[in-house]
C-alpha cells in the first residue's frame, strides 16, 4: 500500500524476497491452487464462511502483488511465473466455489460474496450478478453486517465499487 499511495517502492523492494518465499511456501502446500492456510473470516457475527475460499482469495491477492512487484523491479521470469500462478488460483477458486447459474460463491454469506468481488476474483461477466446477490444478502440481513475480520474490509468496498454505495452507507 505504501507503494500505491506514495509511489515509494523501497519497502516493497526490501520485502520482495520474503513475499516470494511466503507465496512459494503456500504454493508448495496448495497443489490444487486452493489453500486453507490462515484464520479464515475470524470472529464472524453469526455466519461462518469457507476458510478455504477466503484463504485462497488472499493467496491470489498475495501472488498478484508479487507478480506486479516482479514487473516493477524488472524480474521478468518471476513476473511470468507469478502471473500464471495467480491466474491458476483464480480459475481454481471460481471452478470450485462460483455457481455461475446463481452468481453465488460457496454458501452465499456476506463474506463469501464480498471477498472475491473486492479482490478481483469474480469473472467480469459475473460481477453484476454477484454484486446484486451481495446487496440482496445485506438487505435480507436487515442491513446489518454479518462478517468477520476479512469480510469487514471487503463488504463496504465491494458494495461501493459495484453500484451499491447507498446500501453500503446504510
Describe the function of each predicted region.
Residues 1-170:
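Active-site core of glycosidic bond-cleaving carbohydrate-active enzymes
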Amino acid at each position: 500500500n505504501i507503494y500505491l499511495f506514495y509511489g515509494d517502492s523501497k519497502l516493497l523492494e526490501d520485502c520482495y524476497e520474503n513475499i516470494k518465499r511466503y507465496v512459494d511456501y503456500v504454493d508448495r502446500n496448495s497443489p490444487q491452487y486452493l489453500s486453507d492456510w490462515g484464520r479464515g473470516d475470524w470472529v464472524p457475527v453469526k455466519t461462518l464462511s469457507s476458510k478455504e475460499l477466503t484463504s485462497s482469495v488472499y493467496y491470489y491477492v498475495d501472488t498478484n502483488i508479487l507478480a506486479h512487484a516482479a514487473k516493477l523491479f524488472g524480474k521478468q521470469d518471476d513476473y511470468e511465473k507469478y502471473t500464471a500462478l495467480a491466474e491458476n488460483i483464480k480459475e481454481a477458486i471460481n471452478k470450485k466455489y462460483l455457481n455461475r447459474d446463481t452468481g453465488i460463491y460457496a454458501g452465499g454469506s456476506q463474506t463469501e460474496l464480498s471477498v472475491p468481488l473486492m479482490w478481483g476474483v469474480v469473472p467480469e461477466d459475473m460481477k453484476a450478478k454477484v454484486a446484486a446477490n451481495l446487496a440482496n444478502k445485506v438487505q435480507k440481513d436487515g442491513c446489518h453486517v454479518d462478517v468477520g475480520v476479512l469480510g469487514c474490509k471487503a463488504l463496504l468496498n465491494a458494495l461501493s465499487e459495484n453500484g451499491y454505495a447507498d446500501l453500503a452507507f446504510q
